[in-house]
Amino acid sequence: MSLYEHVFIARQDLSNAQAEGLIEHFSTVLADNGGKVVDREYWGVKTMAYKINKNRKGHYAFLKSDAPSAAVQEMERLMRLHDDVMRVLTIKVDKHAEGPSIQMQKRDERERGDRGDRSDRGDRGDRGGFRR
């Protein structure tokens, strides 16, 4: 079996529970066809660079799988037929990266709120710039 990574974007008007339900549904499709989902991540609602089907935002999901190509093709076919899924990207990888994806790492940094490169600065009043 081969290793794959999948990203799909679902419509913005779905609830978080419905978006997570889509992840579960497509994981089941892979399992039913002889594959398995190694890891899954829900990245949340993100703003897209351009509109897709009149949607400016979408629910992003990421799956890592170990599956035969037939299982992946079936899952992609069902994703493309599903009305709630707007875009699908599947890539074949040599090995899965350990730990959370880059998107989840960025999300964790934002939630912490600390900007390590800016901790030495005070309020705006102490900046040197031009004064009248």
Swiss-Prot record:
Domain of life of the native organism: Bacteria
A GO cellular-component term linked to this record: cytosolic small ribosomal subunit
Region (Disordered): 96-132
GO terms (BP aspect): translation
This protein's UniProt keywords: Ribonucleoprotein, Ribosomal protein, RNA-binding, rRNA-binding
Residue ranges with Basic and acidic residues bias: 105-132
Function: Binds together with bS18 to 16S ribosomal RNA.
Entry-linked HAMAP family: Ribosomal_bS6 (MF_00360)
Protein's name according to its UniProt entry: Small ribosomal subunit protein bS6
Protein's gene: rpsF
